[in-house]
Amino acid sequence: MCISSSSLLCGINSLKYASNRVGILIPPFQTASSLNIFRPYVIFSRSHRSLSSVDVSSPSLPLREHLPLKNVYSQVPLLPVWSPIPKGPRRFLLPPKFHYRLSPPPGEFKSSPRVAIMVAVIVCLVNGVVFWHWDLARDEAIRLHDFKRFRFMMTHAQASLFNLYEGRWWTLVVSIFSHQNLAHLLVNCVAIYSFLSIVVYKFGVWKALSVYLGAGVFGNYVALQRMMNEENPFATLPNGPTKVWDLLFPKGPYPPISRPALYLGSNPEYGPIIRTATFVPQSWATGLLGASGAVYATAAIFACLFPYTEFFLFFVYPVKAGIFMPLDFIAEYVLCLLNYEKKFHVAFDAHVSGTFFGVVSSLFLLPAMWKRRSLYCVGIVKKRIWSNKAKA
């Protein structure tokens, strides 16, 4: 039912609608007098930069977009209509920078900036405390030849196949907060402060931490599965474990294997405390350390939310999130296929798994945004097809 402009009597309260187009959706009305139940409220401009305090009953507003459902008076039903094809010609398939349809709707942040920063700082502090214990354990092992603390960290703070074999499943989580050296710790902490704070600000503390820890565990699982495929001492047994899942949930008692000696990989810095393990494959004694899978997941969610946002890589190179993350995913996936993990001592498969986990998580966290993007892209493609047919 259409409403003529002459029946709308209420005016605009300090409208700032000069260059930024603002759109709302007017619900269906029975009579023109029903407009009196509306109240003025603040809406965001399409550029996300300015605010406009307007009256919803103003006849000057285009009836095109919609605001979040919670901002409209609860007694009035909404008619969720969306036009996927924008007005005006387009030269490129991708929309311009900071386009409204590729960004999440404003005003839907689940946390405050102070809480988001506090959560990121707490995660960084936990990483620092765990790294301090690792450094203290290495120092005691090298200088004092006291391996008690070092053996405890190797047993409970790193993810390895042998730890899972002995039932220490929590190492999949604790290893996310462990790091190899100071450079590894600093790089991950900078990334955590940059990306995790934004994810917490957008989705809230519990959802953000669930994605963070879930991506870290998933990355460790994929990397350990790759190690298990390389060397498996139980491969010849009829009921032996063939997957990491079998170690987490054993079907029955497996044959005992000898305990590995102190082992920290092939880093020459810790040569004096490295020992070879008897009857235990190297891949089973090698542990995984680091929060790279979780960090890549938060970076992937950030790229999905704000693909045209630029950030400085290593504080030097400005890159766009929507361009850098796909290129990095392809590069690390190629390195996984070429088996460069042992050469660089980097779990590239954990990075790839974390990125994949972040993208899939964004599909569940913001389904409306992905639906809007798909409709928008389909509309552009159809419009191009129709224009080409018209020219032909």
Curated annotation (Swiss-Prot):
Keywords: Hydrolase, Membrane, Mitochondrion, Mitochondrion inner membrane, Protease, Serine protease, Transit peptide, Transmembrane, Transmembrane helix. GO terms for molecular function: serine-type endopeptidase activity. Residues 1-34 form a transit peptide. InterPro entries: Peptidase_S54_rhomboid_dom, Rhomboid-like_sf, Rhomboid_protease_S54. Its EC number is 3.4.21.-. The keyword Electron transport does not apply. Its main location: mitochondrion. The chain crosses the membrane at residues 115-135, 150-172, 185-205, 208-225, 277-297, 299-319, 321-341, 350-370. It is an enzyme of class 3 (hydrolase). One of its GO terms (biological process) is signal peptide processing. It is a multi-pass membrane protein. SUPFAM superfamilies: Rhomboid-like (SSF144091). GO terms for cellular component: mitochondrial inner membrane; mitochondrion. The keyword Cell inner membrane does not apply. Coiled coil: none annotated. The active site is at 292 (nucleophile), 351. It is found in: Mitochondrion inner membrane. Belongs to the peptidase S54 family. This is Uncharacterized rhomboid protein P4H10.10, mitochondrial.
